Amino acid sequence: MRVPHRRRVAPQFPQVGKFIRVCAYDRPGTTRFDGTLSPSTTVKQPTTAQEGAADLHALLRGAKQKGPYVLVAHSWGGLIARQYASEHPDEVSGLVLVDPASEFLQDTLTPAQWDAFVQLGKQPREPEGIEAVDYGSSAPALRAAPPVRGIPSVVLTSDECFELLPDTGGAERQCQAWREAQDLLAAHLDAEHITHTDSGHAIQAENPELVIASVREVVEAARRKSCALEDKNHGQCHKPEKHAQR
């Protein structure tokens, strides 16, 4: 998960680490705690969810981290996590999506709002090299990808309105579109949908205990599912690893 730079350590990492191993990484172009760019290798911007999934796959292979993983992702990272799960279904045992963006925004925003949202995501950022995202290419690719179903999943949705498209007006309708898109996403994944979060977009910073509880719930469900399968086939229970996406 990407953590606002004002926090030096994501508060949920050490807590989650008490019940499962946590692996976190800095996506190329994300910022450190002081607002400077992370030390990750720079990539061409804007980037797509498909490129993000490929980077994550290469990272896990390079770090020799064996799955299956429970992927935890925030905002744009939600598209990356779902793309990864679609491309590597045997490697993913659960999803925790924290106020995720999704392709369903194209259905709930007006065409003009969607175009503005896509252009906003692709805008060059300062300093040079900071992450810009290509929803216009990522959304149709994710729609065409095999659906991710049959694994424990939780979607956490902000219940405090935030400015999705600054300086365009209609903030309340935009917030409604964001929530409707998350309704569609949760239904698409057959996921538990938690909408009473007492948070804006950065749920992981504003309500970390809820994120921790959701991760625990998905990890335990993934373990039960894995144990049932192992007991049936081999009589041994395997506990999945967890990967937390920053």
Regions found by a protein language model. Give the residues of each.
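Active-site nucleophile elbow and catalytic-triad environment of alpha/beta-hydrolase enzymes
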Residues: 124-145, 176-184
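Conserved HGGG/HGGXW glycine-rich cap/lid loop of the alpha/beta-hydrolase fold
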Residues: 1-35, 215
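Flexible "cap/lid" loop of the alpha/beta hydrolase fold
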Residues: 96-135, 165, 231
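Active-site loop/oxyanion-hole signature of alpha/beta-hydrolase fold enzymes
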Residues: 24-70
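Catalytic active-site module of serine/aspartate enzymes centered on a nucleophile-bearing elbow/loop
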Residues: 191-246
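Conserved loop-alpha-helix segment in the C-terminal half of the alpha/beta-hydrolase fold
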Residues: 166-197, 218-219
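Conserved hydrolase catalytic core segment
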Residues: 66-104
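Short beta-strand/loop motif that positions the catalytic acidic residue
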Residues: 155-157
